[in-house]
Swiss-Prot record:
Membrane topology: Peripheral membrane protein
GO biological process terms held by the UniProt record: regulation of signal transduction
Location of the protein in the cell: Cell membrane
Notes concerning its domains: The PH domain is required for membrane targeting.
Alphabetized UniProt keyword annotations: Cell membrane, Membrane
Organism: Caenorhabditis elegans
Full protein name: Protein melted homolog
Length: 871
């Protein structure tokens, strides 16, 4: 113990207190155990409450000790001793009577407050809080109101990081809340996940506090948050208390929290318990105070409508009213129509009274589906072919369209994920949709019989028979199963046309080798009853190549070209983990992708390159999103590509972009069984385990979205790859454009007559070949035209000397800037590099960075024009 502390504690020499604060912190904390022992002796003395000198000594020593501990960062070493002193102090009264017989803070209360303040200063330090919280909770039972208030604030702060430590004292905290310490209500949601049983037992008393006028709005919101957590874990405990919540649905401050409770109950299949609150939900839907919650209210009403036919009619009435009142808001209108379609697939009779309203809406896919529910005998309208209105393309021609989007480059073929942030998914195939609608209306007929290939061909060409004579008798369907790896089905409808209709027959290669029984699910989807699938002999010319490449050489496998129109409707299973993840985060994904696209675009495709003995790397590809220029640099046939160090982030973004496009265009989610999802998953599986860390693809994409720090890594990678030298963001349409589309005035030199003349000329320094770093720069005079890049050894060539073509623009594979990116390229700020088809490269350096950028842009536009002329 320092001698000044000894004089102060043992001899009560208050005159050394000023010198004590000038002593080094490390000298003060020496022999701390003896110091605390002396403090406890003084605090426990019977004369302490009345001895002013002892009180001053203790206050000075405690202040000096806590300051030394704080400044030296040794709280973990001395927390136990500080807590021990606090425990000794709390054994004494916290209030005392003054001369006016009023309750005031006792001397012990002042020391307790100082110790609590010092300990809870480290509320994020779990070892310290583990020791402090059990003793601090004793303060809640004190008769000193100010001490209880301060302790409550400390515990509320500590609960953010120490919910598990507090959870063992859940019953004590709940008891304090019920007795009137309402500020502790904010703590309850933090400790519930680690100790649920006390909350379930005391839930009735906690919910009663919602009606207490002394509980403020923020505390009531915490109670509703707690109720939502209970609804997610043990909904049956909460359901009896739901009538107490109904009044708060019309409160602007509390409606959002209550709607979250309802959504939690719906996710737990307790929708039926919400039917009694439909009148209040309708009032909320019609009020302008809840305009931000209309989408959520719409979904809740629709889920209630699926419970029974009477509720369906009532729900549809309200949803139609919402559609009328929100016709100008396309997002809400799309959500309402999707929910009406979902109700109509289960209770089609609920839609009949609103048929005139649906017919007044603009024609779209969702309106067609709703109108299809309205006609109980719609088989003829849906299944027959109208030559004037419907396409007469055969199944083979539709399949061939799919492969028009395949990109072939060298020895590999890659498949596009999406084209741009606003790319649309293909519409549902009419035949498949018609078949689903027919079997929805006839789902009571049970299992469907099988039909031979001959009968299929006969029914497809049955133009002279009465409409659906075969279907009305046997209600048969043929189903061709894809190979098991694709997990998709192709449904063949049976159109019966009039005498003027064109007869279509299936090629022999499309003969199904095994038929599969199907059934209609509650959501209106046609699915197999069960059993395995057998492979089918597909046409020899139909191929599909998925990216990335398989381990080893890149190969192309034979498979049926599945029409993307069918993909939306096939096996969209509600038990799909990915489906559920996206379904509950639609708006969040749309907002997130919108923010990301403002910083950088999402790749349109990816490949994995590497052989058996080489390192596998993922290559990502970008294209111009506008393509407004006739010389667009980066089109479907020529993409900007580079190898990435962060495949997980890029695949995550590609997945979110895929879902965002589907949600925006159709209001639906792309599930795990879709071809787009499986393509991305296959790319992930082909990466080595050193990159994937053996994490499943669905686990990776359902994790937290990449944060701003992760996005900054990708922006830096794009910068190093020269992306921002080739693309710019167009703020007017929120798209990333190539140089040609951003600067259309530069394109006219290439596309107008006389474009073969000089476009750009000047002196550049050049290096080429191997070991370039050992060579000197050679100054040459370059001339760029729409056909070639020419150069001469003359500094200023005369008109009589023609420049010989040096590099044909059609032979240039790529050109990139060396002025951005890695620090090692600081000396090449004014340079750019050209790669040719014969695997040679040339580095050219301009007089300044602006001139180098001009050469780079003109070269890119000239290359695009040359490729276009060659095509």
């Amino acid at each position: 113990m320092h001698f000044l502390l000894s004089r102060l504690l043992h001899h009560r020499q208050l005159n050394v207190s000023a010198q004590l604060f000038n002593v080094s912190h490390y000298d003060v904390i020496t022999d701390m155990s003896n110091t605390f022992t002396c403090l406890k002796e003084i605090l426990n003395a019977p004369s302490y409450p009345s001895n002013k000198v002892d009180q001053s000594v203790v206050e000075i020593v405690v202040a000096r000790l806590t300051a030394a501990i704080r400044e030296t960062g040794s709280i973990e070493s001395y927390a136990a001793e500080l807590v021990d002193v606090l425990d000794e102090v709390l054994r004494h009264p916290m209030t005392t009577l003054n001369e006016k017989c009023q309750d005031v803070d006792s001397p012990h209360c002042k020391i307790a407050s100082d110790l609590l303040s010092s300990l809870f200063l480290h509320y994020g330090n779990k070892p310290v809080m583990t020791l402090t919280i059990p003793v601090a909770l004793k303060c809640l039972n004190s008769e000193n109101g100010e001490l209880v208030k301060n302790t409550t604030s400390y515990i509320s702060l500590a609960a953010i990081h120490n919910g598990k430590s507090l959870s063992s004292h859940a019953l004590q905290i709940i008891s304090n809340v019920v007795r009137g310490n309402y500020s502790l209500i904010r703590v309850l949601p933090h400790i519930y996940p680690d100790n649920k049983e006390p909350f379930h037992a005391q839930l009735s008393q906690l919910i009663d506090l919602l009606q207490n006028t002394e509980v403020d709005c923020s505390e009531k919101l915490s109670l509703l948050q707690l109720s939502s957590m209970v609804a997610n874990t043990k909904p049956d405990v909460l359901i009896p208390f739901l009538p107490r919540f109904d009044v708060y649905l019309l409160s602007p401050q509390m409606s959002t929290a209550l709607l979250n409770i309802y959504m939690s109950l719906i996710s737990q299949n307790r929708t039926k318990s919400l039917s009694q609150f439909l009148p209040t939900l309708k009032l909320a839907a019609q009020s302008n105070e809840f305009i931000n919650n209309r989408t959520t209210i719409c979904k809740i009403i629709a889920n209630i409508g699926r419970v029974s036919s009477p509720l369906a009619s009532e729900a549809v009435d309200e949803l139609v009213l919402m559609a009328r009142n929100n016709s100008s808001d396309q997002q809400i209108l799309q959500t309402v129509l999707n929910e009406i379609d979902a109700i109509g697939s289960i209770h089609p009779t609920s839609l009949r009274r609103h048929v005139s309203f649906f017919q007044t809406l603009p024609t779209s896919r969702i309106i067609e589906r709703i109108l299809a529910h309205l006609n109980p005998n719609n088989s003829e309208n849906i299944m027959s072919y109208d030559i004037k209105e419907q396409s007469t393309e055969s199944l083979l021609s539709k399949n061939s369209k799919v492969f028009g989007n395949l990109i072939t480059s060298g020895g590999r073929t890659v498949f596009e994920v999406c084209d741009s942030p606003t790319v649309e998914l293909c519409e549902l195939d009419r035949n498949t949709h018609s078949l689903a609608m027919q079997y929805q209306n006839n789902r009571s007929s049970g299992s469907l019989s099988r039909r031979s290939h001959a009968s299929i061909a006969h029914s497809l060409g049955a133009g002279t028979h009465g409409p659906y004579s075969d279907i009305n008798e046997s209600r048969e369907l043929s189903m061709i199963s894809m190979p098991s790896s694709s997990r998709t089905n192709v449904l063949l409808a049976q159109p019966t046309s009039s005498s003027t209709s064109r007869i279509q027959t299936l090629p022999h290669a499309f003969a199904p080798q095994a038929m599969t029984q199907i059934q209609m699910g509650k959501d209106g989807r046609v699915r197999p009853v069960g059993g395995g699938r057998r492979p089918v002999q597909w046409p020899a010319g139909s191929t599909e190549t998925t990216f990335p490449a398989h381990l080893g050489p890149i190969t192309t496998s034979k498979m049926c070209a599945l029409n993307e129109e069918d993909e939306k409707w096939i096996n969209n299973d509600r038990n799909d983990v990915v489906y559920k993840f996206v379904e509950h985060r639609k708006n969040k994904i749309r907002r997130y992708i919108g923010e990301v696209n403002a910083r950088f675009p999402v790749p349109v495709q990816c490949t994995v390159e590497g052989s058996k003995n080489s390192k596998h790397r993922m290559v990502i590809h970008f294209s111009c999103q506008t393509r407004s220029s006739p010389c667009c640099v980066f089109t479907k046939e020529y993409l900007f590509a580079f190898k990435t160090k962060y495949p997980a982030f890029w695949l995550h973004f590609m997945f979110l972009q895929m879902e965002c496009s589907a949600i925006t265009q159709f209001g639906e989610v792309v599930g795990k069984d879709s071809q787009q999802y499986q393509t991305l998953e296959h790319c992930w599986k082909c990466l080595p385990s050193s990159i994937t860390k053996s994490v499943p693809f669905d686990t990776m994409i359902t994790a937290a979205f990449p944060n701003s720090k992760d996005q900054n890594k990708l922006i830096k990678e794009l910068d190093e790859a020269g992306f921002f030298a080739c693309f710019t963001m167009d703020s007017t349409n929120n798209m990333w454009n190539c140089i040609s589309c951003t600067n259309p005035e530069k394109v006219k030199y290439f596309v107008e007559e006389g474009g073969a003349e000089k476009v750009l000329e000047g002196q550049l320094k050049e290096k080429k070949g191997r070991w370039r770093f050992l060579k000197r720069w050679n100054t040459k005079y370059f001339t760029l035209s729409s056909a070639a890049l020419n150069y001469s050894t003359q500094h200023m060539p005369t008109d009589s000397r023609a420049l010989l073509p040096s590099i044909d623009l059609r032979s240039i594979r790529s050109v990139r800037s060396l002025g951005r990116g890695k620090k090692a390229r600081k000396s090449l700020r004014k340079a750019f590099e050209i790669f040719t088809a014969d695997n040679t490269s040339m580095i050219l350096k301009a007089k300044d960075e602006k001139n180098a950028e001009e050469w780079l842009h003109c070269l890119q536009i000239a290359m695009a024009h040359a490729r276009r002329e060659l095509a």
